[in-house]
Amino acid sequence: VQDFAFIDRIPGRKILLKGNHDYWWTTAAKFYKFCEENGFSNQFILNNNCYYYENVAITGTRGWFFEEDAALGSHNDKIFKRELIRLETSLKAAGEAKEIYCFLHYPPRYRGYQCREILDLFQKYGVKLCCYGHLHGDSHRLALEGEFEGVLYRLAAADYINFTPIRLL
């Protein structure tokens, strides 16, 4: 609750998405109920939707990361396919936005791994910026920062940005 209270006190609307440790937040309804019960009024989630800020569509989903869990096979494949559907639903919701920013928890490209399906969706919908997290500690040095295939990538993991929000617009 303290973390959400801190976030709520920051001026402006906050748009959040689920990470790999957010087991308590199983549905959007549970998240919004939690916010209501705690008096948090300016926190929203990316969940099969998008939000607009001026001419920018803010899209995204958790994503998925195969490299570490390849042995899990079909379980991973089911989750991955669901995340692709969620991402495309969010990107479609952007409509004719002038610019599309996409937020993922997992990196779509890391070390020798790249998620071609996600990268192809970025191309199909004209994503200009992708912010992602998940990488911590020594893995920062292998993160994709900068442009790749016309998309600007930014690592926004909390410890990488020194627990300080970064301005994107």
Indicate residue ranges for each PLM-predicted region.
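Arginine residue identity/basic-tract feature
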Residues: 9, 13, 62, 82, ...
